[in-house]
């Protein structure tokens, strides 16, 4: 967050597009630490089942950002201008740094030494070779990618098919974000009652149903706004339900590599989502057909990845 603070100040003083892009890149590098370290801290502080519940509620809180950010961002831009936005970023970063210094204790075991670059790479190889880790990481990756497929062309698609304005699409996006929050909240509640594995399967079932409904909606003539929006709401709910549980499971089996596992699983998800977003933009033709096909593919791959993770878990149980 100190890097984010410095980058925010640089962005506020930028005099060219290149400087602004560089500052924004450094902001992303700084703030990305939060998602990785948060998961490692949770893994260090809780046993697997409570950790999944904790991550579910953390994910729900993080899901609030897409709902309130556009509203507050628009108001702040009108009040203080675009440079003022970055001063606000810096102020928030300073507050977070102060809070971290005051209330956050070190959760890493005292007898754990810092890893060298070679040890980090060796740890990454161990994780990639582990069917359980790769299964959970890919489940999260493909579930996340399905959301990025829609995000890439969603505004243009809704404007073309239904004539929605930017403000109206912003409202729709807020509702979808609320659906994601509801899914993440439900993940914590259901995992306590059903267990993590069964809850993930419920989420995958909802994801399959949502994808099938979106495929039908993509070829309906005339296109129906309600069917499209229902399928996307279900998709975001499933995303919120599965993501925290898959992320928690990805760091369970190798607690000594919790930080590496958290960073690697997030990196894989970003790469997969970026690839799907690029493909979506390249094949977009003004219809939802391309999105539907890609969503069906990511849904099938998420099912395969979850089967891979469950198979690895069963093998470990038998050996034990």
What are these regions (language model features)?
Residues 3-10, 18-26, 226-232:
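Paired small-residue
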Residues 13-19, 30, 217-218:
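Helix-breaking motifs and short loop linkers at transmembrane-helix boundaries and internal kinks
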Residues 19, 48, 56-102:
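Helix-loop-helix hairpin linking two adjacent transmembrane segments in secondary transporters
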Residues 23-64:
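Cytoplasmic helix-loop-helix junction between adjacent transmembrane helices
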Residues 106-137:
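Juxtamembrane intracellular "pre-TM" segments in multi-pass secondary transporters
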Residues 183-197:
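Helix-to-loop junctions at the C-terminal end of transmembrane segments
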Residues 247-286, 295:
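A late C-terminal transmembrane helix in Major Facilitator Superfamily
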């Amino acid at each position: 967050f100190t890097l984010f603070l410095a980058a925010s100040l640089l962005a506020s003083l930028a005099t060219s597009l290149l400087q602004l892009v560089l500052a924004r890149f450094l902001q992303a590098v700084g703030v990305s630490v939060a998602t990785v370290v948060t998961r490692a801290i949770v893994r260090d502080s809780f046993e697997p089942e409570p950790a999944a519940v904790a991550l579910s509620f953390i994910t729900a809180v993080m899901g609030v950002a897409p709902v309130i950010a556009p509203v507050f961002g628009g108001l702040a831009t009108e009040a203080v201008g675009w440079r003022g936005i970055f001063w606000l970023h810096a102020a928030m970063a300073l507050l977070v740094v102060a809070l971290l210094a005051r209330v956050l204790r070190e959760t890493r075991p005292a007898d754990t030494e810092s890893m060298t670059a070679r040890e980090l790479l060796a740890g990454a190889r161990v994780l990639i070779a582990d069917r359980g880790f790769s299964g959970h990481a890919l489940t999260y990756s493909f579930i996340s990618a399905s959301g990025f497929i829609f995000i890439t062309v969603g505004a243009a698609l809704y404007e073309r098919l239904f004539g929605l304005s930017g403000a109206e699409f912003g409202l729709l996006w807020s509702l979808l974000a609320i659906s994601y929050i509801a899914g993440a909240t439900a993940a914590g509640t259901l995992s306590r009652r059903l267990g993590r594995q069964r809850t993930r399967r419920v989420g995958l079932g909802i994801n399959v149903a949502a994808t099938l409904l979106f495929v039908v909606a993509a070829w309906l003539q005339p296109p129906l706004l309600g069917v499209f929006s229902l399928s996307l709401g279900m998709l975001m709910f499933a995303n919120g339900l599965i993501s925290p549980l898959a992320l928690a499971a990805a760091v369970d089996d190798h607690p000594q590599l919790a930080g590496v596992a958290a960073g690697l699983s997030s990196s894989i998800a970003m790469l997969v989502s970026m690839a799907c977003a690029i493909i979506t933009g390249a094949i977009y033709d003004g219809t939802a057909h391309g999105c539907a096909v890609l969503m069906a593919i990511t849904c099938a791959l998420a099912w395969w990845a979850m089967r891979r993770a469950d198979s690895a878990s069963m093998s470990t149980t038998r050996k034990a």
